[in-house]
């Protein structure tokens, strides 16, 4: 099987889907080639709700699922944070809810999309990433700082920008 991954905001209504995904992963990806990534974006529940206005699993629910999903020697589940100015990033909250044995943390800059501009969101990767990463590693977490190809920003091909432009032109 080829390496595969799934990125999700962990919709609460999709718990059955997650169970099916776990079965598929265990049956078809026995070579540790599957990773799941949960979009977290903030450690403050109200801010998280604002960023992702859907019913979603709590940190504890994500943690319980991740512990079942990741077996010894497999890729850790990733907790993804898009670094946005003004949001809370508290390593102690992550450490209270998640195990560094089963989870790693990935931080990405907010891409300068039309949607981000309309919402007044600004990236603060430089201000947030290093201090947050330092505190997380102090709690035993592996941390990934992930900066995409900046050419994607220039040509507008990240985060669904191309689809949005196409939709507006139709």
PLM feature spans:
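Core AdoMet radical
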Residues: 1-72, 76-85, 104-108
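Auxiliary Fe-S-binding modules of radical SAM enzymes
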Residues: 64-170
């Amino acid at each position: 099987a080829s390496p595969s991954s799934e990125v999700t905001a962990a919709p609460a209504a999709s718990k059955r889907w997650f169970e099916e995904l776990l079965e598929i992963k265990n049956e078809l990806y026995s070579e540790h080639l599957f990773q799941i990534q949960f979009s977290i974006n903030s450690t403050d529940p109200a801010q998280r709700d604002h960023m992702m206005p859907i019913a979603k699993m709590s940190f504890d629910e994500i943690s319980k699922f991740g512990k079942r999903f990741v077996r010894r020697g497999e890729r850790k589940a990733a907790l993804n944070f898009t670094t946005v100015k003004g949001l809370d990033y508290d390593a102690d909250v992550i450490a209270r809810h998640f195990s560094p044995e089963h989870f790693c943390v990935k931080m990405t800059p907010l891409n300068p999309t039309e949607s981000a501009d309309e919402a007044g969101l600004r990236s603060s990767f430089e201000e947030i990433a290093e201090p947050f990463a330092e505190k997380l590693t102090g709690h035993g977490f592996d941390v990934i700082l992930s900066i995409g190809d900046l050419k994607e920003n220039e040509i507008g091909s990240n985060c669904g920008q191309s689809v949005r432009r196409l939709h507006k032109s139709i």
